[in-house]
A protein has these predicted regions:
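Amphipathic N-proximal alpha-helical interface segments
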Residues: 11-13, 17-18, 23
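Residue-level detector of well-ordered alpha-helical segments, enriched
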Residues: 108-115, 175-178
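Hydrophobic alpha-helical packing segments in soluble, helical-rich domains
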Residues: 112-133
């Protein structure tokens, strides 16, 4: 079986065992690191949304929506984007939406904010890639695409020429503005996001989710 160990700068430790029969077993008492684990699982093609949802129920001891219910809610909240998004992005968003709608009562709510911001990052990378703009960490990060040192982020002249579409360009800049604002407030500025400010208020966490979903849907309506 696969044996994965995670640790964080906050002292959290967690072990995930993935057995040959498909069973996932979590060991440890993590805090924010669970959010990274949920995101990691969403990227794994052999781990289903049903498995992720079940692990959420086990870990947080809450009743969450089924995958079909979460997907229906997601489709209702991003009607313009739902059918246009890469399925991996939907797989990241769906469990986070389900958890946000549960009766979750924890000390800290990064468990579903982290995945939705990673989904927004994934969308931005996809949109850049469609215009032939690549970001290759660790030498490059998203900031390398934009003019440095500006209060509002503007694509570099080279990348503006590649995009050659003012509406598309504005969408890229708006996404990065929001993403960087949240990243600097919530996360470390590296390509792999790490929390530096925890989220202790559920309403604040839910507001971030609503913001991200609105940005995604508005972007889809304009350029996807």
């Amino acid at each position: 079986h696969r044996h994965l160990k995670f640790s964080s700068s906050f002292g959290d430790k967690m072990v995930i065992n993935r057995y040959n029969n498909g069973t996932l077993v979590f060991q440890g008492n993590p805090a924010y690191i669970l959010s990274q684990a949920m995101y990691f699982m969403a990227l794994m093609p052999d781990i289903s949304e049903e498995e992720i949802t079940q692990r959420q129920k086990d870990i947080y001891r809450v009743s969450t929506n089924s995958v079909s219910q979460a997907r229906a809610e997601l489709k209702a909240r991003i009607p313009n984007a739902y059918d246009k998004l890469d399925d991996t992005i939907l797989k990241i968003l769906s469990p986070a939406i389900s958890l946000s709608q549960s009766n979750l009562n924890v000390e800290e709510y990064s468990c579903y904010v982290f995945p939705v911001l990673k989904a927004l990052e994934a969308l931005l990378l996809n949109l850049l890639n469609q215009k032939g703009i690549s970001v290759n960490p660790p030498k490059q990060n998203l900031g390398s695409v934009f003019v440095p040192g500006q209060p509002q982020h503007v694509l570099s002249s080279t990348n503006q020429a590649k995009v050659n579409d003012t509406t598309y360009q504005k969408c890229l800049e708006d996404i990065y503005d929001y993403f960087k604002k949240q990243r600097h407030t919530r996360f470390h500025a590296n390509q792999v996001l790490v929390l530096t400010t925890l989220i202790f208020n559920k309403a604040e966490a839910d507001a971030i989710i609503s913001d991200v979903l609105k940005i995604i849907d508005d972007t889809a309506k304009k350029i996807m």
